[in-house]
Design a protein with these regions (language model features):
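Residue-level detector of the short coil/turn that links helix A to helix B
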Residues: 26, 67-68, 110, 159, ...
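N-terminal alpha-helical scaffolding segments that mark the starts
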Residues: 1-71, 86, 93, 105, ...
Length: 728
């Protein structure tokens, strides 16, 4: 530029102009370099305060958009506010933007008190600007919505659910006054999110879920098509809610919609990326000097066409929103924007939901495909963060903690489901290797994944039980119980430990099982949903059978089977219920019913490739044929059972000789040493994801207290396999 040869002021202006031009071309690294140069000596001294503040805001926004240089962005924003505050001529929108961006940075850095302080200052500034007429009503309401949503996130990060809900209520009121369906749905979804996190009143949660559904249904088809981020957010929240209340049939319908939407969205995202690349090439050509008029006119026409195509494809008015579409699933209009989770994480989460609704039905082939696909994508995302072999959490940059925690938690969710599938299929080596991976990730990232320690202990118990180490299994289940404050998970640990004690077979172990299951039985109606109840009834029925009380056991188990069949849809649990009921029918000499029940049970066990349960059923069939004096059937059945037993023993021997077997079953808890500094940072991260007691993915609009995990809502144990048991 000719201005570059002029005085320092002109050089600074030239750099700012170059930055603006680079931003238009979406060459953000060049734009950031130009802005940085303009704000550095000797150019910075010549900038007027307002121009300097604008430049610092632009640079900070670029750094935040690319998730780089949080500390640098914070310094620029703090300096920008110092410049803007005493300037009466500074536009209110600029000051409000500075407050909002700085609050966002404080949130990302875990400085929640500073975040809340800046947000309250922003709200005070907003009230003053609105009262003086400097800010029209509509922008004022939008900024109110923005600050209240951020404030709710800050409160949630501190575990103050009541204050978070209050802030969301204030934001929702502003959205209603704006008559914005998008913001109405945004705040309704965040309110549901908050209720799911604290879950103090089931009716309030149900009402929040119903309001979200009603608002979504009221949208036009065009709005539903264009507000893709809100679609994924609300559908996943509804899915988490339905899984929590054990309405798997309704949850499956939401998962089907999500899965279809992911496929469509991936295609659309690819098309947008292609058009965006083409647009960038056209704009680079337009920036070349000495273009002929005809060439320039053709390029301008092409540029207009591409922009129109992009807008039509996405439904956004702002071109930057369109071009960012391939990276973000936006939830709300400016100045809020924001995403819930990274786009890729949302797609991976949908894969996980498919696994979770498919696994109890025994659809293992689809589960396997989704698990492998999810793991591959997660490893790719972790590689982008520098998390490769040998890297531990002490090597992580602070800005990467939240994203790393999210993907690491999703990784463990997929591995947990892999362990569950392989144990059900009696593929013990595969289960062992997946569990060993979980243990390895925990030891490498003990702070971020600390909340998964209880789940891993529980899975060690599941593995130990499956390969016949019942004493070790009970130890790990009870260790898992100590590591969680989640009442539901504690109950399931008691159930699993009780089953392991029963399988030991001696009188003392049966007494220990009764001590565990008795308190759980008395409180089983207090849980949300019916998962805990069906499992507790199952174990209680086993104990009654062991105590030679077959009629009472039969009555209890029949009630549990009805719930398991109608509400849970977990065919392994149904198979095992049927097996015990068939056994009881035989004990009561009801051979006709016993035969019919056992046939149904065996069909389900074969569907699941569940060899231990098949052997269990075959052993009962042998007794049945012996009582009926059907010698031929007895011998044939016994021979078939022997083949199955040989197959099982081969699998067990292979697992027990594996190098990782002993360290997984031994009665020693995994030793982890969380890093104190990282733990403090991670606990303060508004979207951190590592506590097994908190089963939900975090949102930008609303985050959780303490390090939390996707499992806070997903709660994979809600459809966990019932532990296999071999009771004679």
């Amino acid at each position: 530029m000719s201005a570059a040869a002029g005085p320092s002021m002109s050089a600074a202006d030239g750099l700012l102009a170059l930055a603006e031009e680079a931003e238009r071309r979406r060459d953000f690294s060049t734009a950031a370099s130009c802005l940085d140069s303009a704000l550095s000596p000797p150019h910075a001294a010549s900038l007027l305060p307002l121009a300097e503040a604008r430049a610092r805001l632009r640079l900070a926004a670029l750094l935040l958009a690319r998730s780089k240089g949080l500390a640098t962005a914070k310094a620029h924003l703090e300096r920008a506010l110092l410049l803007l505050n005493p300037l009466p001529s500074a536009p209110p929108r600029l000051k409000l933007l500075a407050h909002s961006l700085l609050a966002n940075v404080y949130g990302l850095l875990g400085a929640v008190p500073s975040q809340k302080h800046v947000l309250r200052r922003g709200l005070a500034l907003l009230a003053s600007a609105s009262a003086s007429g400097l800010l029209p009503a509509e922008p004022s309401l939008l900024w109110t919505s923005n600050f209240q949503a951020q404030l709710a996130s800050a409160f949630a990060a501190e575990g103050d659910a009541a204050s978070a809900l209050s802030a969301l209520s204030e934001g929702a009121a502003a959205a209603t006054e704006l008559e914005s369906p998008q913001l109405d749905l945004f705040f309704a979804a965040n309110t549901l999110h908050a209720h799911l996190l604290c879950w103090e009143d089931s009716n309030s949660v149900a009402d929040a879920a119903a309001r979200v559904a009603d608002l979504w249904d009221a949208l036009t088809d065009q709005e539903k098509e264009h507000w893709v981020g809100l679609f994924f957010y609300t559908e996943l929240l509804q899915t988490f809610y339905l899984l929590r209340v054990c309405d798997y049939k309704a949850a499956s319908k939401h998962v089907e919609r999500l899965d279809t939407a992911v496929k469509s969205e991936m295609q659309r995202g690819q098309r947008i990326k292609e058009l965006g690349t083409e647009l960038s090439a056209v704009e680079r050509s337009l920036a070349q000097p000495m273009l002929k008029e005809r060439e320039r006119a053709a390029l301008v026409h092409k540029q207009r066409q591409l922009k129109d195509q992009l807008r039509a494809l996405c439904g956004y008015d702002e071109l930057n929103d369109v071009l960012d579409y391939g990276d973000k699933l936006l939830l709300a209009p400016p100045p809020m924007h924001g995403e819930w989770l990274p786009r890729t994480a949302v797609f991976v989460l949908v894969d996980l939901m498919v696994v979770m609704v498919s696994r109890p039905k025994g659809i293992f082939r689809e589960c396997g495909k989704r698990i492998q696909s999810g793991l591959q994508i997660i490893h790719e995302e972790l590689s982008k963060l520098g998390i490769v072999d040998g890297v531990t959490e002490e090597n992580l940059e602070h800005s990467a903690i939240w994203t790393a925690g999210l993907y690491l938690t999703l990784l463990l969710q997929f591995l947990e489901n892999s362990v569950a599938v392989e144990l059900t299929r009696s593929e013990f080596v595969e289960a062992l290797e997946a569990l060993a991976q979980m243990k390895n990730w925990l030891t490498r990232f003990p702070t971020i994944l600390q909340g998964s320690e209880s789940t891993i202990e529980m899975l060690r118990g599941q593995y130990a039980h499956s390969v016949g180490y019942f004493d070790e299994a009970a130890f790990h289940f009870l260790e898992a119980l100590k590591l969680t404050e989640n009442k539901s998970m504690q109950s399931m640990c008691q159930v699993y430990a009780a089953v392991s004690y029963i399988c030991k077979g001696d009188a003392e172990s049966s007494s220990e099982a009764l001590e565990l299951i008795g308190p759980a039985y008395r409180t089983m109606d207090s849980f949300v949903g019916v998962r805990e109840k069906t499992c507790i009834i199952f174990v209680y029925g086993l104990l009654l059978m062991r105590q030679q009380n077959p009629q009472e056991a039969r009555t209890r188990l029949a009630s549990g089977l009805k719930i398991a069949h109608q509400q849970l849809g977990n065919i392994q649990l149904v198979s095992q219920y049927l097996t015990i009921l068939g056994t009881l029918a035989l004990q009561l000499h009801d051979t006709g019913q016993a035969k019919e029940i056992l046939k149904s049970s065996f069909t389900l066990a074969k569907t699941l490739y569940d060899i231990p349960t098949q052997i269990w059923i075959l052993s009962v069939f042998t007794e049945l044929y012996r009582e009926l004096e059907e010698r031929g059937n007895e011998l044939e059945n016994s021979g078939y059972a022997s083949k199955k037993e040989i197959d099982l023993q081969k699998r067990l021997t292979e697992a027990r000789s594996h190098p990782f077997h002993q360290e997984l079953v031994e009665k020693v808890r995994i030793e982890i040493q969380p890093m104190h500094d990282l733990m403090q940072k991670h606990h303060e991260m508004p979207g951190s994801v590592a506590n097994a007691d908190l089963d939900i993915p975090e949102s930008v609009g609303l985050s959780t207290p303490q390090p939390s995990s996707v499992r806070r809502l997903i709660d994979t144990s809600s459809v966990r396999r019932s532990t296999r048991r071999r009771v004679s």
